[in-house]
Amino acid sequence: MSAIQKRLSNMEVRFDESEVIVIDMGSGFIKAGYSGEDLPRVVIPTIIGERENTQEDNSTQPGDSKPNKVFSKKFGNEAYAHRSDHDLHYPIRRGIVKDWTRMTELLEYVFETELQVNANQATVLMTDCPMSNKDDKHHLAQIMFEHFKVKSFALQNTAVLSMFSNGTTTGLVAESGEGVTYTVPVFEGYALPHAMQTMEVAGQEVTNKMISQL
């Protein structure tokens, strides 16, 4: 048995190969789909657009009606398309979730609208940013089990998954996304966080620099 097979066989969560939903949450984009497929089915910006609307509450006595604040929300590409009349919110900053409420709403949108699946019948594998701490991992697992009530859930380091995708278990992974760049040494399928290096210069800074040169 190869090192990769041994590593995978020791994972605590066993999955039904045909029904695993894979979700990659990034600062710039969320990608989601099914394991075994070549490409994700969903690629949307990690954005929520909100616009505050006011409507009268007519449930009280005549003359006592009060305005209610109602938020119009849009997600992903639709949010970006309506950026002129919606306030944009970015739940993930520099690879770390900063707004768990909006992150949960965005995941609801991915499950219900984009993938059109019932989360409580789903088996989910989600990528984990190498910089996330234990509290972040626990919070995400709590949301998946208590809010979405998924059948099974696993969280795996993105650097380790990159190693597996290249058919090896040991090496140095360098990744640069929308909000953060990092290098992570991986040995026999385990990331070495004490040797990780990070830099908060990534795709967004490159984009901003190019725009400034136009």
Predicted regions and their residues:
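Charged, surface-exposed interaction regions in soluble eukaryotic proteins
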Residues: E105, V124-D135, H139-V180, V186-E200
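Glycine-rich phosphate-binding loop plus the immediately following alpha-helix
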Residues: E50-Q55, E188-L214
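Conserved phosphate-binding loops in N-terminal lobes of ATP-dependent enzymes
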Residues: E19-I143, S152, P193-M196
